[in-house]
Amino acid sequence: MADWTVRVHPQAEAELKAIPADMQARFLHIAELLEAFGPQKVGMPHVRPLERKLWEMRMHGRDGIARAVYAAVQGRALLVLHVFVKKTQATPRSAIETALKRLESVK
């Protein structure tokens, strides 16, 4: 099929482990969808564009809402840059800035 891979930035891996287990399971489900079908075929309610090259995975759980910000890098790879529990309606600017800094560090 699509042959996409989802990788996780080392700092985002620690953030992912810190969110509740049900949200981690949802993250894995969305990552599997992205790998199987590619980012062009997966949309709302699973993923949504943020700005520039950034997209977000949307995870819901018993304890609230979490997001994983990712970008396409080198070929058919998606790199998860930042994972956080969302507390406001809008994605915090600081979360976007963190993801952009991490994206620059891997280029």
Where are the regions that the model predicts?
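Conserved Hanks-type protein kinase catalytic core
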Residues: 71
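Portal/gating segments that form or line small-molecule/metal binding sites
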Residues: 68
